C-alpha cells in the first residue's frame, strides 16, 4: 500500500514538472523570482547605512532572487555593492560631488569600477530618495536580465512631481474604478492599517512615483474634518519611508459646509482665514503634506465663479494658505458648461486670459486632450499656449473609455503620441513634454498626473495587463523619452517571462492594442459615442430627453445623410484657431488633417476619398472590422502562450480577451449599422457581416453603477 502511495506521489510530481506555480498578480512587476547564481551579479558584499530604505529594499529583493542576504562589511570584497550618499567617504572617493549634486536629491548614479577580483558597483545620490530610485533601477536591470559589469548610468526625473490621482470616495467606492473598492478602507482606519499601503508605496517608488492624491476630485468637505485628517496621517506614515507625499482633493465650499460661514468667496477675509487655519492644522498633523487638488466650477461642483471670481483668484487664495508650509495647488482645467460653444474650446477660453495671474505655487492640471480622455484626441491647445503659468498633463490610467478592466489596452503608445505632439508654439520641436517638463518654459513647478486604476482586487488593477499601464505611467513620468517598446519589454520580463518565444509576440500585442481599441471603438477621430452614464460599450444613438447636449453622442458625431464629424475648422466652431501655426493650418484643411483625427476636426461627406482611395464610409467599415480581427489575433496569440504562463493568470487573461472580442463585435455592429442609416451605403462585401440587429443593440441597458 505504501509503495502504491509513493508511486502515485511520484507520478503526480512528474506531471507537475514544467507546470508553473499559480500566481494572483499581487506581486505586480516586483516578483523577484529565484534565479540561478550564474545569472545574478557577482556581488560578494554590500555596504551602506543599514537603516537606509534603499539598502533594505535591495536586500529584501536579493534574498528572494538568490536565497540569501548579501553580507555586510565582513564579506569578501571581490565585488562590493555600495549604496550611499556624499556623507559616505567611499562614495566621495568614487564619484565626483559636483556630478551628483547636478542630479538633485532624486537623481542617482549607478557605476561599476575596478576590474578582476576587485570591483565596486556604486549606487550614489545626494538624497535618500535618489538612492531608493537607484536601487530599484539596479534591481530592474537584474530582473530583466539587462545587468552588466560595465554599468555607467546617470539619471534624474523629468518631472518634479509624479503623482497618482485616486478617484476614491470616502464610502469605499471608486469613481471610474474597475478593480474593486478603494484600497484606503477608510472605515477601518485608524484601527486597522492595511499591509497593502506599504506594498502600494513600494510599487510606486519602484517606478519613481513620488506623490498621491488619496480622494476623488469630486470631493466632499468631510475629508478636511479632524476625523479624516487623522486617517490621512496614518496613510501618510506608511507611504513616507518610500518618499511618497500625500495630497488631498478639496471641495471649494468647505468653509461654508464645515464651519457655517456665510459663503466660500475667495475674497472674503473670513474664508481666507479659514483656509489658513485649516492649512496650519493639516501641516501640524502631516508635516510633509503636499497640497490640494481642486476641481472647481465643473460638472456642478462649487468654485470661485459662484461669487463672480476667477479661477486665478480661487487658486491663489488656497496657494497663499499653503505657501508658508511649502504646499502647492493643482487646479484642474477640466471646465465646460452647457452653452452653445464647442466644448473643446471652453478650457482654453477660460484659462488663457488668466495666464500669468496665478501664484508660483499653483500649477494648472490639464487633461491630455480638449474633451475627456477619449480613445484618441488631439493634444489640448493649452499646452504651449500658456507660457507664464505652469501646466501639468493629466493622463487617465484607469480605462473609463477603453473597456474598463475587461479590455487589454496598453496606454504607453497613446501617451507617447501625446507627449511627443509638437505644439509649434515656440517653433518646431515644441513637444508637449518639453512645454511641461521645464525644458522650454522654466517654472518653479513641473508635474504630471495619472488617474489611478488601483483597487482591492488581488491583482490591483482588475486585468493583469492593466498593471502595465500603472507601470508605464511611472516610467514616463520619470523619463518621457523612454519608448513604449522599452516599457512593454521591461514589464513583460519582470511580470511574466524573459523567454523570447513569449516576450516578442506579447510585446507586439501590447504595442498594437491601443490602435486596435481605437479602431473597433472610435476610429478616424470619432469621439464621445459611448453609452450614457457608465461609458461602457457603444451608444451613438443615445438621446436623453432634457439632458445636456454636450453629454450626448449626436453632439459630437453629427451624422447626417451628408456626412459625419464635428466641424471645428474656421468655418465651423473654429477650435483649430486655438492651436499655434502651422498646427492650426494642418488641422483646418481636410487635405492635410491627419486621418486619425479627421472626424474630430471636420464634417466629412460619406463618399470623401481617403488617402488609400477608399471612401470615408468604406474606410470606417474596414477600420471597425480591422479592430475586431486584430482582437481575435490577440486571442490566438495568447492561447499559444500557455506554456509560459501560470494557469491562473493565463486563464484570467484568456477570459478577458473573450470578453474583449465580443465587445469589439458589439462596437462594430452598433456603429456601422447605426451610421449606415445615414450613409445609405452597403458594408463592403469582403468584411464580416453584422451578427446583431440594430434595434436589438439599442435595447441594451447595463446596470454598472456599482461595478466596483
Positions of predicted regions on the chain:
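Structural motif
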Residues: 46-52, 82-88, 124-126, 168, ...
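Acidic, contiguous N-terminal accessory segments
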Residues: 13, 20-116, 149-150
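Bacterial N-terminal signal peptides
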Residues: 7-16
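Feature activates predominantly on carbohydrate-active enzymes
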Residues: 50-57, 61, 97-293, 323, ...
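Structured segments of extracytoplasmic/periplasmic soluble domains
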Residues: 57-68, 138-145, 285, 321-325, ...
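Catalytic domains of carbohydrate-active enzymes that cleave complex glycans
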Residues: 430-708
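Positively charged n-region of N-terminal signal peptides that target proteins for export
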Residues: 1-7
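Catalytic-core regions of glycoside hydrolase
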Residues: 188, 226, 234, 260-489, ...
Amino acid at each position: 500500500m505504501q509503495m502504491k502511495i509513493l508511486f502515485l506521489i511520484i507520478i503526480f510530481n512528474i506531471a507537475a514538472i514544467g507546470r508553473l506555480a499559480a500566481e494572483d498578480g499581487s506581486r505586480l512587476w516586483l516578483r523577484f523570482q529565484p534565479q540561478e547564481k550564474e545569472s545574478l551579479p557577482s556581488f560578494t558584499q554590500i555596504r551602506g547605512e543599514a537603516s537606509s530604505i534603499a539598502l533594505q529594499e535591495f536586500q529584501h529583493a536579493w534574498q528572494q532572487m538568490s536565497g540569501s542576504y548579501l553580507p555586510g562589511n565582513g564579506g569578501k570584497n571581490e565585488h562590493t555593492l555600495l549604496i550611499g550618499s556624499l556623507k559616505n567617504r567611499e562614495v566621495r572617493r568614487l564619484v565626483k560631488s559636483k556630478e551628483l549634486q547636478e542630479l538633485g536629491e532624486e537623481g542617482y548614479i549607478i557605476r561599476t569600477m575596478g576590474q578582476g577580483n576587485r570591483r565596486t558597483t556604486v549606487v550614489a545620490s545626494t538624497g535618500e530618495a535618489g538612492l531608493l530610485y537607484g536601487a530599484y533601477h539596479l534591481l530592474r536591470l537584474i530582473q530583466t536580465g539587462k545587468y552588466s559589469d560595465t554599468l555607467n548610468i546617470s539619471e534624474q526625473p523629468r518631472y518634479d512631481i509624479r503623482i497618482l490621482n485616486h478617484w476614491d470616495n470616502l464610502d469605499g467606492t471608486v469613481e471610474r474604478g474597475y478593480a474593486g473598492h478603494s484600497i484606503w478602507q477608510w472605515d477601518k482606519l485608524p484601527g486597522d492599517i492595511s499591509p497593502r499601503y506599504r506594498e502600494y508605496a513600494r510599487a510606486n517608488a519602484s517606478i519613481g512615483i513620488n506623490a498621491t492624491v488619496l480622494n476623488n476630485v469630486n470631493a466632499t468637505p468631510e475629508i478636511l474634518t479632524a476625523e479624516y485628517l487623522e486617517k490621512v496621517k496614518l496613510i501618510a506614515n506608511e507611504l513616507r519611508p518610500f518618499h511618497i507625499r500625500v495630497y488631498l482633493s478639496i471641495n471649494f465650499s468647505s468653509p461654508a459646509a464645515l464651519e457655517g460661514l456665510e459663503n466660500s468667496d475667495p475674497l472674503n477675509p473670513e474664508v481666507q482665514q479659514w483656509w489658513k487655519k485649516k492649512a496650519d492644522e493639516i501641516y501640524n498633523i502631516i508635516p510633509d503634506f503636499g497640497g490640494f487638488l481642486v476641481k472647481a466650477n465643473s460638472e456642478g461642483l462649487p468654485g470661485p465663479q459662484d461669487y463672480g471670481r476667477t479661477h486665478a483668484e480661487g487658486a491663489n487664495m488656497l496657494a497663499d494658505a499653503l505657501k508658508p508650509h511649502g504646499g502647492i495647488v493643482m487646479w484642474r482645467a477640466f471646465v465646460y458648461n452647457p452653452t452653445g460653444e464647442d466644448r473643446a474650446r471652453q478650457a482654453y477660453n477660460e484659462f488663457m486670459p488668466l495666464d500669468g495671474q496665478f501664484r508660483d505655487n499653483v500649477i494648472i492640471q490639464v487633461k491630455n486632450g480638449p474633451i475627456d480622455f477619449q480613445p484618441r484626441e488631439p493634444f489640448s491647445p493649452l499646452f504651449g499656449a500658456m507660457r507664464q503659468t505652469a501646466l501639468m498633463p493629466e493622463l487617465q490610467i484607469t480605462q473609463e473609455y477603453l473597456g474598463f478592466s475587461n479590455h487589454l489596452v496598453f496606454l504607453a503608445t497613446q501617451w507617447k503620441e501625446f507627449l511627443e505632439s509638437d505644439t509649434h508654439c515656440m517653433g518646431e520641436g515644441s513637444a508637449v513634454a518639453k512645454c511641461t517638463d521645464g525644458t522650454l518654459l522654466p517654472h518653479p513647478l513641473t508635474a504630471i498626473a495619472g488617474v489611478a486604476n488601483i483597487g482591492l482586487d488581488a491583482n490591483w488593477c482588475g486585468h493583469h495587463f492593466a498593471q502595465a499601464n500603472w507601470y508605464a505611467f511611472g516610467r514616463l513620468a520619470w523619463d518621457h523619452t523612454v519608448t513604449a517598446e522599452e516599457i512593454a519589454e521591461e514589464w513583460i520580463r519582470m511580470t511574466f517571462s524573459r523567454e523570447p518565444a513569449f516576450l516578442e509576440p506579447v510585446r507586439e500585442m501590447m504595442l498594437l492594442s491601443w490602435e486596435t481599441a481605437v479602431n473597433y471603438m472610435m476610429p478616424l477621430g470619432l469621439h464621445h459615442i459611448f453609452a450614457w452614464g457608465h461609458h461602457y460599450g457603444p451608444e451613438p444613438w443615445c438621446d436623453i430627453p432634457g439632458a445636456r447636449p454636450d453629454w450626448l453622442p449626436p453632439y459630437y458625431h453629427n451624422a447626417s445623410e451628408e456626412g459625419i464629424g464635428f466641424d471645428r475648422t474656421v468655418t465651423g466652431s473654429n477650435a483649430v484657431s486655438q492651436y499655434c501655426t502651422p498646427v492650426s493650418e494642418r488641422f483646418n484643411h481636410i487635405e492635410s488633417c491627419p486621418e486619425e483625427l479627421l472626424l474630430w476636426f471636420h464634417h466629412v461627406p460619406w463618399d470623401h476619398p481617403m488617402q488609400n482611395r477608399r471612401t470615408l464610409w468604406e474606410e470606417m467599415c474596414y477600420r471597425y472590422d480591422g479592430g475586431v480581427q486584430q482582437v481575435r489575433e490577440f486571442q490566438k496569440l495568447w492561447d499559444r502562450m500557455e506554456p509560459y504562463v501560470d494557469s491562473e493568470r493565463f486563464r484570467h487573461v484568456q477570459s478577458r480577451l473573450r470578453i474583449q472580442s465580443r465587445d469589439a463585435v458589439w462596437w462594430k455592429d452598433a456603429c456601422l449599422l447605426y451610421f449606415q442609416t445615414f450613409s445609405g451605403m452597403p458594408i463592403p462585401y469582403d468584411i464580416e457581416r453584422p451578427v446583431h440587429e440594430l434595434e436589438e443593440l439599442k435595447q441594451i441597458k447595463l446596470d454598472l453603477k456599482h461595478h466596483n
